[in-house]
Amino acid sequence: MAVQQNKKSRSKRGMRRSHDALSTAQLSVDATSGELHRRHNVTADGFYRGQKVINK
């Protein structure tokens, strides 16, 4: 097992974790139906970038 040679300070730990924060989901308005959806994802009614891609 790896064991650290010296204890890492709170500052170094914080600097390492500075990139771990989660960002909020980016939402867009669909041009066809006007509903909100996540970026780069198909809407609930099956549209993606103005085209019908899923038939239910």
Swiss-Prot record:
Protein name as catalogued: Large ribosomal subunit protein bL32
Comp. bias (Basic residues): 7-16
Keywords: Ribonucleoprotein, Ribosomal protein
Domain of life (superkingdom): Bacteria
Family matches, as NCBIfam families: rpmF_bact
Record Pfam families: Ribosomal_L32p (PF01783)
Chain spans, region Disordered: 1-37
Any one GO molecular-function label of the UniProt entry: structural constituent of ribosome
Coiled coil stretches, renumbered: none
GO cellular component: large ribosomal subunit
Organism: Shewanella pealeana (strain ATCC 700345 / ANG-SQ1)
Biased amino acid composition, Polar residues: 21-31
Gene assigned in the entry: rpmF
